[in-house]
């Protein structure tokens, strides 16, 4: 009898243990399932581009116009102390850089060392300034935010500015007459248009050197880089053309555009490029050439103001903004219709343009 009693107790213990383990496993499984459920309170990442809210123009008359893109009106004018040639907003949207050229003698082409002014975009107040080379043309931020690179047109150099402490940490020799530049998305290579020798210099932000040079065409003014860093564009003022350089094959195709092309800008998806056709002061052009980069043809020539110079496209590719140098205006183009929907008066001689 005692043996049977012990067996019954043992069976009860085993059954209880099995039930306990089963319940415990179910609880763990339920807890795991709960953890796998999405938390609606956590904001999910959004890959959609944020529409631009502010536009800045570099006015060579000595100012920066600040345009509210909700109203397409100038809401502020920042006075500078020299020829304001180009502007660029940092990748995080917090800093505006502007290149300032300082002529040695009024109304001459000879310059002393220029500078880059840095502004807080939340207040439009000056936060720092850095001396660079003679006649600084374009300034561009690396995508990682570490550097600002400046093309010094009369020094044949590029200044590398460390954005942590606002100091020039290196000066790299380029070709003759560097002007427009763009930095690859990997923040490693810089492509500089050398107006004086028909070439593009490729600079390294790793070892701060000029690693190569490519003959691209007559009088390249500015460059653009495709999203995959494989295609380089250059506006060729001396040929009235857009050069399309495929770095993987080495081929260069040229697309005829308007007279005296100045800046070129590529859509964020790499499908189209926009070339501002400036012409000359005596015979200004007034168009934007919209180039299909797949077919390498001009799909539209859009009439804007006289002396179209600077061009930028919103990240969502809905709008194109153009500075009209000889009209002192900015044209706003609806990219879906290729029509100008607004013309905004700014200060005299608007040149570079950027969005925040």
For the regions a language model picked out, list residue spans one by one.
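Bacterial N-terminal signal peptides that target proteins for export
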Residues: 2-10
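C-terminal motif of bacterial Sec signal peptides marking the signal peptidase cleavage site
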Residues: 19-22
């Amino acid at each position: 009898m005692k043996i049977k009693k012990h067996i019954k107790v043992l069976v009860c213990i085993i059954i209880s243990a099995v039930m306990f383990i089963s319940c415990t496993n179910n609880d763990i499984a339920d807890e795991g399932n709960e953890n796998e459920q999405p938390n609606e309170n956590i904001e999910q990442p959004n890959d959609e581009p944020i529409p631009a809210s502010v536009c800045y123009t570099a006015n060579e008359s000595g100012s920066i116009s600040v345009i509210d893109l909700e109203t397409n009106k100038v809401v502020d004018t920042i006075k500078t102390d020299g020829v304001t040639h180009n502007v660029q907003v940092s990748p995080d949207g917090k800093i505006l850089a502007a290149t300032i050229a300082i002529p040695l003698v009024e109304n001459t082409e000879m310059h002393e060392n220029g500078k880059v002014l840095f502004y807080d975009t939340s207040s439009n107040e000056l936060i720092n300034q850095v001396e660079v080379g003679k006649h600084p043309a374009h300034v561009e931020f690396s995508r990682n935010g570490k550097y600002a690179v400046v093309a010094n047109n009369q020094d044949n150099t590029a200044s590398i500015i460390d954005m942590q402490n606002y100091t020039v940490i290196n000066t790299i020799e380029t070709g003759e007459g560097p002007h427009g530049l763009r930095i690859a998305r990997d923040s490693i290579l810089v492509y500089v248009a050398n107006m004086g020798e028909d070439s593009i210099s490729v600079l390294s932000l790793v070892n701060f050197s000029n690693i190569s040079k490519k003959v691209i065409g007559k009088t390249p003014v500015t460059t653009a880089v495709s999203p995959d860093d494989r295609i380089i564009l250059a506006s060729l003022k001396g040929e009235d053309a857009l050069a399309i350089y495929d770095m993987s094959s080495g081929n260069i195709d040229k697309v005829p555009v308007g007279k005296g092309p100045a800046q070129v800008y590529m859509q964020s998806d790499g499908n189209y490029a926009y070339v501002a056709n400036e012409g000359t002061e005596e015979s200004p052009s007034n168009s934007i050439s919209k180039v299909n980069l797949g077919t390498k043809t001009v799909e539209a020539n859009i009439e804007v103001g006289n002396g179209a110079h600077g061009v930028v496209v919103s990240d969502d590719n809905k709008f194109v903004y153009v500075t009209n140098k000889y009209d002192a205006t900015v044209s706003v183009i609806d990219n879906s219709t290729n029509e100008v929907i607004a013309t905004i008066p700014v200060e005299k001689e608007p040149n570079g343009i950027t969005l925040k």
